[in-house]
């Protein structure tokens, strides 16, 4: 293990802040489709969480976020350069662990990492020629769904579960990832400060694309057009932000966004068809439901 004092402090910052750990939990859950006692399963779960943590350090720099998991972000404490390098070290550590899990696991992790980065790139550069909603969903599949899909697949692969389970688990994870992010969009508007670890409307003010705003752009009534003009003006003042959040909370696009998240969770559950009936399948279905029932 690397004993560099600063890196130890910075890389443990978000670990100690908590979090849901939903990705490694999914790896452990899917391992019960095979021999869940294999040590490689624990290593796979570690790879998933290290990769996820690395992306958080980079995401927070790109989003200029002040809070993560209710604590100050790494870059707000140590600066952008240190935060970026901390993310790099976490990716390096994930690569070290996955290198011991065989060629296939290594390739799957590398392919997922590429998708993850491209998803982030496409979100950053923005949409040019594609339908805005289609583009957004594809970004979510790549940026979030890909790693959740890998989490499920590695659990099955490294527990020597049936080969035929890997494809449906990949589809499940990707759909759950989309549902998760769509609920995040809703939570950004609906949450109280202490529920989600960030202030309501954080993404809204940062002009980060979210489903409610994408759906709002399709509306033509006067109230929707006026609200969109307010949002597009930048929400510089707290009063404007609070006004936009209040209007969005009561707007039909919120219910439409929740319905979309629920539909992706249902799609995730439908993808589990090839899996055997039993406790693992039931737990995966409950996992998909929990993603859209959360409020923080």
For each predicted feature, which ranges?
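Mg2+-dependent prenyl diphosphate-binding active-site environment of isoprenoid biosynthetic enzymes
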Residues: 2-226, 289
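A generic alpha-helix signature
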Residues: 21, 89, 146, 256-259, ...
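Juxtamembrane/interfacial segments around transmembrane helices
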Residues: 137-139, 260, 295-296
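Short, amphipathic C-terminal "tail helix"
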Residues: 264, 270, 277-296
């Amino acid at each position: 293990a690397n004993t560099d004092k600063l890196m130890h402090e910075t890389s443990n910052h978000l670990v100690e802040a908590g979090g849901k750990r939903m990705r490694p939990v999914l790896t452990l859950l899917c391992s019960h489709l095979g021999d869940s006692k294999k040590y490689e399963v624990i290593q796979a779960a570690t790879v998933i969480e290290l990769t996820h943590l690395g992306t958080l350090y980079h995401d927070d720099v790109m989003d200029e976020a002040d809070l993560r998991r209710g604590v100050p972000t790494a870059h707000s404490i140590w600066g952008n350069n240190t935060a970026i390098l901390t993310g790099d070290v976490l990716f390096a550590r994930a690569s070290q662990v996955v290198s011991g899990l065989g060629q296939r696991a290594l390739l799957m992790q590398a392919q997922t990492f590429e998708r993850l980065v491209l998803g982030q790139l496409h979100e950053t550069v923005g949409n040019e020629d594609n339908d805005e909603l289609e583009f957004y969903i594809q970004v979510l599949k790549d940026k979030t769904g890909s790693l959740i899909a890998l989490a499920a697949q590695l659990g099955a692969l490294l527990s020597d579960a049936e080969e035929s389970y890997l494809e449906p688990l990949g589809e499940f994870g990707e759909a759950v990832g989309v549902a998760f992010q769509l609920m995040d969009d809703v939570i950004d508007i609906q949450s109280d400060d202490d529920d989600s670890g960030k202030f309501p409307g954080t993404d809204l003010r940062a002009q980060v694309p979210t489903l409610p705003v994408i759906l709002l752009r399709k509306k033509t009534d006067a109230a929707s057009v006026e609200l969109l003009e307010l949002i597009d003006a930048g929400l510089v003042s707290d009063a404007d932000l609070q006004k936009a959040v209040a209007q969005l909370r009561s707007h039909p696009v919120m219910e439409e966004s929740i319905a979309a998240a629920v539909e992706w969770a249902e799609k995730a559950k439908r993808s589990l068809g090839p899996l055997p009936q039993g406790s693992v399948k039931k737990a995966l279905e409950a996992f998909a439901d929990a993603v859209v029932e959360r409020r923080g």
